[in-house]
C-alpha cells in the first residue's frame, strides 16, 4: 500500500504518517511535509525521487506527473489499466492526503497580488480530484479532523466503498469551495464583486427538523464558521423559522452598540423594541408595544439574560430567547417550560457577521446586492426640511425609529416614544395604510402616542401620512425624501409644527 501526504496545514500530519507507516504504507511526500515527516522519524520518499523528475519552476510543478496521477487514477480491477500501469512503471497510490495552499488566509493578510497568485494551489486540487474520481480504489483526505477516523477504519478493515464515497463527496466540496473563493475574490478585486458568475458557498451547521413547513426539508448553512463560533443552544433546538426570526431580532437588537436593547420579533417583523436604563425595563416597554403578537415570539437581548429578566419574560409564553449571554440562575427559571428555546452567543453583547452581500432566491435564479445598513450617520447628516428642529431626546428616538424601519418589511412606518417603539405598521401596499394600521393597533393596546416620533423606510408620496401622524401627536419625522410631492409633505409638517428630516437614503425591504 502507498500513501501520498502533501499538506499546508501540518497539524497532526506526523502522527498520521506514523500510523500509516505502522499499517504498512509506503509514504510519499513533497516539500515542507516531506521535511517535517523525515525530521520526526517517518520513513518517507520524496515525490521527485519517486517520479524521477525534479520539482520545477520554484515548486509550481511537483506532482503533475503521470506516475502520480496514473498511480491514483488507474482502476485496480481493469486489466487494461493494470497492463498500462505495468508497461509505464506506474505504481498504485492508495491513499491521498492533501490540503491546499492557504489562499483565503493570504488574501486576508496581504494585498500583494503576486503573493496571492502564488498561493493558488494547482497540484493539490488536481490530486484531490483524481483521488476522488477513483474513490472505489483510493481513499482521499482533505481534512485533518478525519485522520483519526481513517486510521481507525483501516485498523478495523472497514475501508469499504461507502466510507470512501463519503470522503469523495467531502473532497469535491472542498475543492469546489476553494475554487469558488478564488473566483469570488478575483471578481471582488477586479469587477466590484459582480462578475459574470457568483458562487455562494456555505458549510452545514445542522439540519432543522423541517423547513418553513413540515413537508419541506431544511438546514442551516454558515459563512466563515459564524454560527459555529457564535451560536450555542442552551435549551431546545432551533427550527428553520426560529432561525429566520432570530436573524431579524438579533440584527435589530445589536444595532445600538452596547445599549441595553431588547427586540421582540414575530414572523420576521418587529412587534416590540426598547432601549431603557436596563434590560428589564427595556423588555417591559418593548412588550407594551404589542403584547398579543409577542406571544410565541422571539426575544433578542443585547446583554446578559439574568434571573430578574428571566422571571419577567417567563410571565408570558415566548418561543425563543437569543441573548448575548445567559447566567445559570436565568436558565433555572425556565426549567419547567418544555417548549421554550434558549440560545446564546457567549459574548458581552450581541454579535452580527456584517455580511458584505445579500441575496434572495427568485424562480430560476437569485438576485444579489450589497447588504443594506442603517447607519447612525444618516440621521446626523440628514437635512432639516422643516422650520422646527427636533429636540435632543426626539433625535434619539428618531435614530431608533429609523433603524427599526430599515429592518422592517416595506411599506412601513414606525412610531417611537422615550426609547420604546409604541406603534408599527409594516408590509402594507400603501404607506397611509401602514400609518393607519399602526395607530389603530396602538389605540387597541392603550398606548399614548402624544409626543412620539415617526420614521419611514421610504419617502411619503403624499401628505396624507403626515396628516395621520398629526392626529396622534407626532412631533418629529425622519424619512428619505425624494417624492415629487416632497414640498407638500414639508408644508404639512410645518402646518403641524413637526420637525422633518430627509436622509436621502431609502431602505426598502421586500
Curated annotation (Swiss-Prot):
Gene Ontology MF: a single term: IMP cyclohydrolase activity
InterPro entries according to UniProt: AICAR_Tfase_dup_dom_sf, Cytidine_deaminase-like, MGS-like_dom, MGS-like_dom_sf, PurH-like
Lineage top rank: taxon: Bacteria
GO cellular-component term (any): cytosol
Keywords: Hydrolase, Multifunctional enzyme, Purine biosynthesis, Transferase
Reaction catalysis annotation: (6R)-10-formyltetrahydrofolate + 5-amino-1-(5-phospho-beta-D-ribosyl)imidazole-4-carboxamide = 5-formamido-1-(5-phospho-D-ribosyl)imidazole-4-carboxamide + (6S)-5,6,7,8-tetrahydrofolate; IMP + H2O = 5-formamido-1-(5-phospho-D-ribosyl)imidazole-4-carboxamide
GO biological process, any: 'de novo' IMP biosynthetic process
Residue ranges occupied by any MGS-like domain in the UniProt entry: 1-142
EC number of this enzyme: 2.1.2.3, 3.5.4.10
Keyword Transferase: yes
PROSITE patterns listed in its UniProt record: MGS
Domain remark text: The IMP cyclohydrolase activity resides in the N-terminal region.
Family affiliation: Belongs to the PurH family.
PANTHER family linked: BIFUNCTIONAL PURINE BIOSYNTHESIS PROTEIN ATIC (PTHR11692:SF0), BIFUNCTIONAL PURINE BIOSYNTHESIS PROTEIN PURH (PTHR11692)
Alphabetized NCBIfam families for the sequence: PRK00881.1 (NF002049), purH (TIGR00355)
Name this polypeptide is given: Bifunctional purine biosynthesis protein PurH
Source species: Campylobacter jejuni subsp. doylei (strain ATCC BAA-1458 / RM4099 / 269.97)
Upper classification of the organism: Bacteria, Pseudomonadati, Campylobacterota, Epsilonproteobacteria, Campylobacterales
